[in-house]
Each structure stands twice: as structure tokens, then as C-alpha cells.
Amino acid sequence: MEPMERAEPESAYELFRRGSGLLAQRHPGAAAVVLERCLTLEPGKASIIEALGRAYFELGDHARAAERFQAMVDANPLADYAHFGLGLSHLRLGHAAPGRRHLRMAVFLKPENPDYQRALRRVEAG
């Protein structure tokens, strides 16, 4: 009988791909678990933080989503998607003023994005 081989731990890249795949398949809870492991291997990596923000948002954990998107905005104030996600998260948490402010910033940074435009119009319409 041959000794069992130990599986190599997954790399950050493999974890990110798996987590992103789970997110695309609409499994945000499983994606969040995998992406949190990935983040421990690559702390501060914007793509991982963004995917985690999306996963938490889709789970309905808007406070955690806001934390992740805020970390992205802090690291890169010109990250349009981070402002968009942060704005939507704030709105879901009942924080209208910061939500509106971040959606406006997303539109300012990327005015050609119809999703950003639509979200801002909805908020400003009341």
C-alpha cells in the first residue's frame, strides 16, 4: 500500500478562480468562504476584495459588503465599481446620503456605465 500523498494547498489564484466561479454560479455563501481563504494568502488584493464585496452583497450581508467596498475605495479612490458597490450597500443599510454620494462618484468616474446611471436615477427619483 502506497502512502497517501498530501494534496498541495490551493494557491491564491486557484482559490480566486474557484470563488469567482461559485459567485458566477450564484453560490455567494460558498464563494465568500473560498474568497476569504484567498484573501488570507493575498491580503489587500483588489480583485479578491471586490469579489468578496459582491459575494456579501448577494448574500444580503450589506454591512460586510460595505466594509469590503470601503476598503477598495480607501486603497483606490478612483475605483468606480467600488463606489458603485459601496453606494448600493449603503442604500440597503438605510444610509441614503452616503449611498447617493458614492453612486454619484461612480457615475462621475465612469459616466458611460448604464448600470451606474440607472441606479443613480432611481435614488434621485426618490
Q: What is the predicted function of each stretch?
A:
Residues E8-L41, E58:
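Alpha-helical segment of the N-proximal tetratricopeptide repeat
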